């Protein structure tokens, strides 16, 4: 199941079935069996006309290679999905201009794709997908072709927009750092099958098998694992202790400890209530790379 208004990451090695899977969701590739249920309606039961309408209204897609129309201006590229919905030109321009501004490209309305950098073109692709106001966003290796700094910038733009829009996003990637940064849940594929589907913390702390362990073995655990994932539960704080938020990562906890040595570490929720404590042993075990078989 993919949770509504969350980012579901799907990752795996090349050839594991990631891109095939995402194209099954909107039937760009026809599934051979099974069901695709969206709000209890089976996408496989839709007629050609119903499927076309479903793609126009309910689901948008962002591709790795941008897929912009080279002969259309940026504003017309963003408004393309709206033109298919038969909206008037004034409405299309208004909506497209809004999303162009949201992705930081105001002033580029009359440019053509070949006049923009790769990162700028992918911003246009994201704006085009969002302009249709579809509830579901499919992103197939959307940032993989970008330089590291531009990729990080696009990840931040996506997260900022998601905090406001609460879309249901299926995000395909082979980059574990990217998956851990943006995913509410991560599904790891192997030969078309899901090996593990869990939240990022659980993936790192409790890999399902050796295949998943190999995926995560080189990750900097201190930058990923949060206090709430390794704490022991308690309800009353210790007097004179160091209080940290449940979402603080271990790397930042270490920084706090160097400023406040010899203090017990208490973990608080977002309301400031003590919910646990962390011992030095728990902290070190969280940072330590698990033993390989």
Regions found by a protein language model. Name each.
Residues 26:
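Helix-to-loop junction immediately C-terminal to a conserved catalytic motif
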Residues 34-42:
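Conserved ABC transporter NBD signature motif
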Residues 41-42, 83, 90-107:
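Conserved ABC ATPase "signature" region
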Residues 112-116, 120:
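Conserved ABC ATPase signature
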Residues 131-135:
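A short, proline-enriched helix->beta-strand linker immediately N-terminal to the Walker B motif
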Residues 191-192:
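Conserved ABC ATPase "signature" C-loop
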Residues 197-198, 206, 277:
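ABC ATPase "signature
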Residues 239-262, 266-271, 278-293:
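The conserved cystathionine-beta-synthase
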């Amino acid at each position: 199941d993919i949770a509504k208004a969350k980012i579901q990451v799907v990752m795996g090695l090349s050839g594991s079935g990631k891109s095939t899977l995402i194209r099954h969701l909107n039937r760009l590739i026809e599934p051979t069996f099974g069901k695709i249920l969206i709000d209890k309606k089976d996408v496989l039961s839709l007629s050609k006309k119903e499927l076309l309408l479903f793609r126009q209204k309910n689901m948008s897609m962002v591709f790795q290679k941008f897929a912009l129309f080279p002969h259309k201006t940026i504003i017309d590229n963003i408004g393309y999905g709206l033109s298919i919905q038969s909206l008037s030109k004034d409405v299309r321009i208004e909506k497209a201009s809004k999303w162009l501004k949201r992705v930081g490209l105001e002033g580029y309305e009359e440019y053509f794709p070949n006049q923009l950098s790769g990162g700028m073109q992918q911003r246009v692709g994201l704006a085009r997908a969002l302009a249709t106001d579809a509830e579901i966003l499919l992103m197939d290796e959307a940032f993989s072709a970008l330089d590291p700094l531009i990729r990080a910038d696009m990840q931040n733009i996506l997260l900022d927009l998601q905090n406001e829009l609460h879309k249901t996003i299926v995000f395909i990637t082979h980059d574990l750092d990217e998956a851990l940064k943006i995913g509410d849940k991560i599904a790891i594929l192997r030969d078309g099958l899901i090996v593990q589907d869990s939240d990022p913390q659980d993936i790192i702390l409790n890999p399902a098998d050796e295949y998943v362990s190999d995926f995560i073995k080189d990750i900097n655990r201190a930058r990923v694992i949060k206090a709430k994932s390794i704490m022991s539960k308690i309800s009353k704080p210790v007097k004179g202790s160091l209080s940290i938020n449940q979402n603080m990562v271990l790397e930042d906890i270490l920084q706090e400890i160097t400023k406040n040595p010899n203090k017990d570490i208490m973990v608080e929720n977002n309301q400031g209530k003590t919910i646990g404590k962390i011992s030095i042993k728990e902290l070190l075990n969280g940072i330590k790379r698990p033993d390989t078989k």
